[in-house]
Amino acid sequence: DWTGEFVREHTRQKLAFGSVSLLPPYATHRETAVLCLNPVHAKPFVDFYYAFHEKYESFCKGIGSFSAVSEDKPVIHCTLSVVRITELQDALELVFQNDVFTQAEVTALEIYTYPMRLIKRFDLTRA
């Protein structure tokens, strides 16, 4: 399987979360926005992201323009929550009250069904 092969060829990725963002309301979801943390775009992490998504998108279509590298404009992000627009102030206050702008490490890739049920975990090796 291609995910296992990808993991064997790549190592864990260090990253830092440097900002918060919102993905705008769209289609039938006009009353909500997606609240995200954004990693700093360090080249090793961006290269890892693109390498994974190029392979992933050859198998899975319709992942959305905010994640797709095939459209060459992904918004690299970590989703925190889907928030009602009227509750954004409270959500942002919660984010800023916690230590979310920190270092992190991608240690594995996981495949899920929707709703969130783990199918398989692929651990990345240390660099």
What are these regions (language model features)?
Residues D1-A127:
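Histidine-dependent nucleotide/RNA phosphoesterase domain, centered on the 2H-phosphoesterase fold
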